[in-house]
């Protein structure tokens, strides 16, 4: 549904951005929290879906669905990378070739509608080595996205870099407070507990949304 006269931010991404059903609490995507840091007059439509890559999101018709609704002055926030590195043919893209080809479809599609695309690098996974150093698990995808954003003159928000800095500052133990690390029996959805280093809890999702909002301000995006 298009809401005439209301500026809208559409979110296209994976599980780190997606909304979750109440029974999955406390796991949260940061897209569920971004409304806390932008003007109330701006509408957020979160179309991010767990497990999707820049390729599979398009192949399933999800970008087309957004482009049927988006209008001049709206924004399309695009965050993929976690699943683009998967080996299955449905999702895999190569960071310096097909990844760019699919991301350009988001860029070109939004611009054709008079809307503004924004590229957002995939969130850093919380993986520390035995020496307490953070491990890069995304390979070239974040750098590749930044290069494409520069080439296409698209605003770029480096949430990979920002979240990595935060994890390094907090360290191995304290950074768990942002992720879905739960004891057995703590929540019905996770009876055996969980140690998830990719997906954030409510506190972490809100912190990431704050990072995104800070970047929006620094980029002087015309939101609100």
State what each model feature region is:
Residues 1-49, 63-76:
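Serine-esterase "nucleophile elbow" of acetyl-processing enzymes
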Residues 4, 61-206, 210-224:
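Alpha-helical cap/lid subdomain in secreted, periplasmic
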Residues 13-15, 51, 84, 123-124:
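Short, histidine-centered active-site or binding-site loop motifs used for metal coordination
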Residues 14, 47-52, 91-92, 128:
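Short, basic, glycine/proline-bearing loop/turn elements
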Residues 19, 29, 42, 55, ...:
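Sparse, context-dependent recognition of short Cys/His-centered cofactor- or disulfide-binding micro-motifs
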Residues 19, 54-55, 86, 128:
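Glycine/Thr-rich phosphate-binding loops of Rossmann-like dinucleotide-binding domains
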Residues 53-61:
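Structural motif
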């Amino acid at each position: 549904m298009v809401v005439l006269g209301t500026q809208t931010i559409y979110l296209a991404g994976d599980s780190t951005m997606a909304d979750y059903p109440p029974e999955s609490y406390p796991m949260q995507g940061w897209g569920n929290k971004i409304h806390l840091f932008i003007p109330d007059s701006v509408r957020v439509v979160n179309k991010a879906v767990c497990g999707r890559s820049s390729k599979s999101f398009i192949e399933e018709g999800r970008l087309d669905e957004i482009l049927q609704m988006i209008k001049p002055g709206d924004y399309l926030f695009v965050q993929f990378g976690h699943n683009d590195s998967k080996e299955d043919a449905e999702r895999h893209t190569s960071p310096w070739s097909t990844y760019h080809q699919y991301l350009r479809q988001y860029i070109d599609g939004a611009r054709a509608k008079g809307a503004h695309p924004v590229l957002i690098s995939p969130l850093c996974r919380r993986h520390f080595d035995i020496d307490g150093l953070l491990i890069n698990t995304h390979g070239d995808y974040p750098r590749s996205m930044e290069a494409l954003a520069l080439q296409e003159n698209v605003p770029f928000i480096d949430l990979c870099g920002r979240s990595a800095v935060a994890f390094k500052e907090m360290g191995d133990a304290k950074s768990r407070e942002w992720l879905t690390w739960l004891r057995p029996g703590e929540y019905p959805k996770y009876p055996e507990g969980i140690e998830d280093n990719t997906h954030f809890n409510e506190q972490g999702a809100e912190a990431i949304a704050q990072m995104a909002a800070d970047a929006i301000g620094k980029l002087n995006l015309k939101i609100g």
